[in-house]
Amino acid sequence: MRMQTKLIHGGINEDATTGAVSVPIYQTSTYRQDAIGRHKGYEYSRSGNPTRFALEELIADLEGGVKGFAFASGLAGIHAVFSLLQSGDHVLLGDDVYGGNFRLFNKVLVKNGLSCTIIDTSDLSQIKKAIKPNTKALYLETPSNPLLKITDLAQCASVAKEHNLLTIVDNTFATPYCQNPLLLGTDIVAHNGTKYLGGHSDVVAGLVTTNNEALAQEFDFFQNAIGGVLGLQDSWLLQRGIKTLGLRMEAHQKNALCVAEFLEKHPKVERVYYPGLPTHPNHELAKAQMRGFSGMFSFTLKNDSEAVAFVESLKLFILGESLGGVESLVGIPALMTHACIPKAQREAAGIRDGLVRLSVGIEHEQDLLEDLDQAFAKIS
């Protein structure tokens, strides 16, 4: 089954009892049991609920996993992933990892005895050099947030297996429509379902799946024991959003390429970070391991001091956090999504105060170009 079809018919796509083609919202906290210890598959909605289960089956199907897990936010899902590790374990993280993940690791997980080394994961030699005897996991974002670096997933998975490391991939930017890390040899895939999967800026959710039965059993335990499960309304909304993911991603990508090409030629722009451009250093790798380039990219202005005035002059591009909705968003990572990362570390990774990140929506492309044009005119 092709991905466009699987988005609609994958997982559990109808209600087994009534035949309803949209899985209902089972708005219940508990379930009648036939006898002590004998139930119909559900006991309590933290442990399991048919609406959430349908979503979990869907993400597993889309990514090639054995089981999926839905959490109350993307960070709740990442926390569950890192719960696999123990005190004394070491992790490799990307140098432009999402600020929330950086904060989770460096402010919370370090208290549990975990340590990390920050590297450029798109450089395989850096990964090999950074592996220690106590390294247990390699955490990857590809494309990365916000510099859109592309990491070779197959090569990383091979190196990880040589050293008995878990390979964890945040697939939020690419989505299952454009990239399937498990099929390239990795162990765990995480998504911030708030973004492209939901697609309408009305859900907060996290999804995790794995192709390893033993890991799936551990996630099953963590999800129930920690309790950060996704609510039923959000589970239903996310399933509805996923049905149109293919159509939306095609529109996002078409617009993103158009905007990126416009910016690359603009005299006030220094550099555009978009893997869909032939000038991107990992363009060929992105073409090889992805089926599209997503609608996310960043760019730097030649004058960093103009960045704030520029983004505040935009009208269609909404100044705000998040990404992946049908509406276009703009932000300055150094001052917003990545502000929790120390300035020196941000700048060393290339996240300057003048770096602007765009989540290109599905509006008419000409309207987006005109909005950018008028914002540039105001800072000229």
From Swiss-Prot:
Q: What does the note under cofactor report?
A: Binds 1 pyridoxal phosphate per subunit.
Q: Which residues carry this modification: N6-(pyridoxal phosphate)lysine?
A: K195
Cofactor(s) essential for the protein: pyridoxal 5'-phosphate
Query: PROSITE patterns in the record, alphabetically?
Result: CYS_MET_METAB_PP (PS00868)
Reaction equation(s) it catalyzes: O-succinyl-L-homoserine + L-cysteine = L,L-cystathionine + succinate + H(+)
Q: Where in the cell is it found?
A: Cytoplasm
In alphabetical order, the GO MF annotations are: cystathionine gamma-lyase activity; cystathionine gamma-synthase activity; pyridoxal phosphate binding
The record's subunit annotation is: Homotetramer.
The job of this chain, per UniProt, is described as:
Catalyzes the formation of L-cystathionine from O-succinyl-L-homoserine (OSHS) and L-cysteine, via a gamma-replacement reaction. In the absence of thiol, catalyzes gamma-elimination to form 2-oxobutanoate, succinate and ammonia.
Q: Which family does it belong to?
A: Belongs to the trans-sulfuration enzymes family.
- Full protein name: Cystathionine gamma-synthase
